[in-house]
Swiss-Prot record:
Keyword presence, Iron-sulfur: no
Enzyme class of the recorded protein, top EC level: transferase
Family designation: Belongs to the SHMT family.
InterPro entries: PyrdxlP-dep_Trfase, PyrdxlP-dep_Trfase_major, PyrdxlP-dep_Trfase_small, Ser_HO-MeTrfase, Ser_HO-MeTrfase-like, Ser_HO-MeTrfase_PLP_BS, SHMT-like_dom
Organism: Clostridioides difficile (strain 630)
Cofactor: pyridoxal 5'-phosphate
Known EC number: 2.1.2.1
UniProt entry keywords in alphabetical sequence: Amino-acid biosynthesis, Cytoplasm, One-carbon metabolism, Pyridoxal phosphate, Transferase
Protein's pathway: One-carbon metabolism; tetrahydrofolate interconversion; Amino-acid biosynthesis; glycine biosynthesis; glycine from L-serine: step 1/1
Oligomeric and partner information: Homodimer.
Gene3D superfamilies xrefs: Aspartate Aminotransferase, domain 1, Type I PLP-dependent aspartate aminotransferase-like (Major domain)
GO biological process terms on file: glycine biosynthetic process from serine; tetrahydrofolate interconversion
The name this protein goes by in its record: Serine hydroxymethyltransferase
Taxonomic lineage: Bacteria, Bacillati, Bacillota, Clostridia, Peptostreptococcales
In-chain residues carrying the UniProt-annotated modification N6-(pyridoxal phosphate)lysine: K227
């Protein structure tokens, strides 16, 4: 594979080769990353990238789209089946585009919206001042209870009744517990607000029935396809049928032009995988591994925000380890453990330094690791962050990654 690239552009080939070796060598604990299957990867690199297909199935602005229509329809039908959704738009290029698409469809500049505070687990597109969402719309932030580490629904209700938002946004990028979407629905109904759920991080768990399905209560549900869903980089919007025309118009021609049909095809492949029993078993293991890793870290005197996890991610509070999130990320990377610094709720260090590390188990689970391997990973993390023993940690990491190859099917690059 990639032999033509090797001849045509050896510089890019070598960079790709080094990146593949890094992925094989390292333990990947970034909660938003995963490892796609070979069929998904093959579809992304296919001739479907040659085709322009502005519009939607049966209503394109270019000729020759009959087979593209087949592909996009399959993707739509499959994801609707996974989540029991009434309508799906699979064209968003990213989760951010999916979120902005919903806002563009249903809000006007200056409308009042509620979203989770970024430093307490939310996402940039949920109203952060530096993001277009926070500049075009008037966002009010809710957060978590300082003692429990859980979403403070009393605060959510209080703010909602005070500001009367047109929309409430639920969902998070660094929240380790199950989110009660029904409670968000109750509050939204009390103030006459629309409810949008961003389930980008937990979509795979929802698909497997391991988390509340927001499609049952929300007006709009957005997701990425590359995290726990284990597909290509992209986004999706799910909504009630009554909003379908508004959503489709907002994506095209509203904020995007031609869809990426090679990516939509690989989304369809990913969705077929997500309908399988094997995928459900995989998600069960993702959750088991997260709990096992959390328990092993607690044994080693690590503090976890909320005291544990209900999903695929863990948020470490490093304030008792005398190390910042930024320094911890670097030290872990030196030991071949990839993670990301992350703010913890009420973080004194700010977003560039932070006091926390976010960990996730989707990628290591895809490689085949189980609960007993989480104990080894926890030991490696402890060696790095408590004892500054990166060399010993590297030995543990290499032993694991050599045991669990990235792609067993074939040698991707020589």
């Amino acid at each position: 594979m990639f032999e033509n690239l090797k001849k045509a552009d050896p510089e890019i080939y070598e960079s790709m080769k080094r990146e593949l070796k890094r992925q094989q060598r390292n333990i990947e604990l970034i909660a938003s990353e995963n490892i796609v299957s070979v069929p998904v990867m093959e579809t992304m690199g296919s001739h479907l990238t040659n085709k322009y297909a502005e519009g939607y199935s049966g209503k394109r602005y270019y000729g020759g789209c009959e087979y593209i229509d087949e592909v996009e329809t399959l993707a739509i039908d499959r994801i609707k089946k996974i989540f029991g959704a009434e309508h799906a738009n699979v064209q968003p290029h990213s989760g951010a585009n999916a979120n902005i698409g919903v806002y563009f469809a249903m809000l006007k500049p200056g409308d009042v919206v509620m979203g989770m505070n970024l430093s307490q687990g939310g996402h940039l597109t949920h109203g952060a001042p530096v993001n277009i969402s926070g500049q075009y719309y008037k966002f009010y932030e809710y957060g978590i209870d300082k003692d429990s580490g859980l979403i403070d629904f009393d605060e959510v209700r209080k703010i909602a009744h005070e500001v009367k938002p047109k929309m409430i946004v639920a969902g998070a990028s660094a929240y380790p517990r199950e989110i009660d979407f029904k409670k968000f629905r109750e509050i939204a109904d009390e103030v006459g607000a629309l409810l949008m759920v961003d389930m980008a991080h937990i979509a795979g768990l929802v698909a497997a029935g391991l988390h509340q399905n927001p499609c049952e209560v929300a007006d709009f549900v957005t997701t990425t396809t590359h995290k726990t869903l284990r597909g290509p980089r992209g986004g999706v919007i799910l909504c009630k049928e009554k909003y379908a025309k508004d959503i489709d118009k907002a994506i095209f021609p509203g904020i995007q032009g031609g869809p990426l049909e090679h990516i939509i095809a690989s989304k369809a492949v990913c969705f077929k995988e997500a309908l399988s029993d094997e995928f459900k078993e995989y998600q069960v293991q993702v959750a088991k591994n997260a709990k096992a890793l959390a328990e092993e870290l607690i044994k080693r005197d690590f503090k976890l925000i909320s005291g544990g996890t209900d999903n695929h991610l863990i948020l470490l509070d490093l304030t008792n380890k005398n190390i910042t999130g930024k320094a911890a990320e670097k030290r872990l990377d030196d030991a071949y453990i990839t993670a990301n610094k992350n703010t913890i709720p009420f973080d004194p260090n700010g977003a560039l330094v932070t006091s926390g590390i976010r960990l996730g188990t989707p990628a290591v689970t895809t490689r085949g690791m189980k609960e007993e391997d989480m104990a080894i990973i926890a030991e490696a993390i402890d060696l790095c962050l408590t004892y500054d023993e990166e060399s010993k940690a590297r030995t543990l990491v290499v032993g694991l990654t050599e045991k669990y190859p990235l792609y067993e099917e074939y040698n991707v690059m020589d």
